[in-house]
Amino acid sequence: MGEEAIVLYPAPPIGHLVSMVELGKTILSKNPSLSIHIILVPPPYQPESTATYISSVSSSFPSITFHHLPAVTPYSSSSTSRHHHESLLLEILCFSNPSVHRTLFSLSRNFNVRAMIIDFFCTAVLDITADFTFPVYFFYTSGAACLAFSFYLPTIDETTPGKNLKDIPTVHIPGVPPMKGSDMPKAVLERDDEVYDVFIMFGKQLSKSSGIIINTFDALENRAIKAITEELCFRNIYPIGPLIVNGRIEDRNDNKAVSCLNWLDSQPEKSVVFLCFGSLGLFSKEQVIEIAVGLEKSGQRFLWVVRNPPELEKTELDLKSLLPEGFLSRTEDKGMVVKSWAPQVPVLNHKAVGGFVTHCGWNSILEAVCAGVPMVAWPLYAEQRFNRVMIVDEIKIAISMNESETGFVSSTEVEKRVQEIIGECPVRERTMAMKNAAELALTETGSSHTALTTLLQSWSPK
């Protein structure tokens, strides 16, 4: 048989892809003799956001090969009934199964495939992996607490017949603090949601895998990890995180990155609040204005990544017309506003940054932890409200941005939280402790290194 290989199958969004690539790099660092093959389904939106990244990885890591599948057009691509991106994503992945099967067949003929690792969203591929002999693992790109929820969701469904999660006052999940039903992942809040039953099925399928790899570490989510193995009775979990991108600046954004970092060089230590909300984090024009007013009133130094509102997403971003009149000139001594993108990891690791206003995407949380930067939690979509409860109430490395019932955040609230996170905030010390714990987990005797070693040994020829 040919060269030994590991096949990775990420979900298309950039955050999922980056996490899976980091997993591939980590596997290679421990076993360079392996080759990594990543199967790519074209993303249904913003395909340009992944193209340059993929090119960069390909040129830097010759042992990582990307296999691009043809684009598919799902039935719901033009549907107005879809109210979150998960439904489109799941349909595209399901429609891609025939192409995935052909790719796996080809890889199996040319390589000795030791294992396949799939994203949680790619569960539909289990329908075809039974045709092959290699073991299949899940890679869960959110935290262990969210994984515990996914395991327990079928039980919640059975024990609360007819009830929508959003209407349940308190939900109890093993290893997770009690939280409001409305804080559960958005896709499962209502039973008549088009993907609700799919997520129930996902929860039931988890235990059918050979194991689950989680991008977390024991000290960060010890209670949730323990609950999965003991209360939910699934022992083959491998918390091998934190897996985050390094601080290297992507070539396409060199000028913008250098500009951000040069500006930070001129700021006092731990004086700057960094506001960044991910590739899908969009605000209405009214909310953008409210953020601007709050930042100006706070008097704090800030670096703010601004994207176009949804209604203007396809137009050129004009900061002067989007922001309050005169805002840029009035705040130029204390603030910097950048369009669409900033080098998040280098920014978070800069000594001038003292706080991070984040959408609570799991990658961003881990990046902040590894940089020792406390967070202001402002969730926007997917499982981010769930993550907020975890980092505010359980792990205590963030404070919460409070919103109205409609999700709107006032300028006064922005002002208060920005001032609080830069001041003598109690979560700062806790965040630094977690930074140290993350570093320890990756050492030779650390929990994550041990979990990864155990996983790799299971793939070795018997």
From Swiss-Prot:
Gene Ontology MF, one: quercetin 4'-O-glucosyltransferase activity
Key words of the record: Glycosyltransferase, Transferase
Alphabetical list of CDD domains matching this protein: GT1_Gtf-like (cd03784)
Any Pfam family hit: UDPGT
Record has Glycosyltransferase as a keyword: yes
Enzymatic class: transferase
InterPro entries linked to this entry: UDP-glycosyltransf_plant (IPR050481), UDP_glucos_trans (IPR002213), UDP_glycos_trans_CS (IPR035595)
Keyword Transferase belongs to the record: yes
GO cellular component assignments: cytosol
Binding site for UDP-alpha-D-glucose: 279, 342-344, 359-367, 381-384
Function description: Possesses low quercetin 3-O-glucosyltransferase, 7-O-glucosyltransferase, 3'-O-glucosyltransferase and 4'-O-glucosyltransferase activities in vitro.
Protein's UniProt name: UDP-glycosyltransferase 88A1
Gene name of the encoded protein: UGT88A1
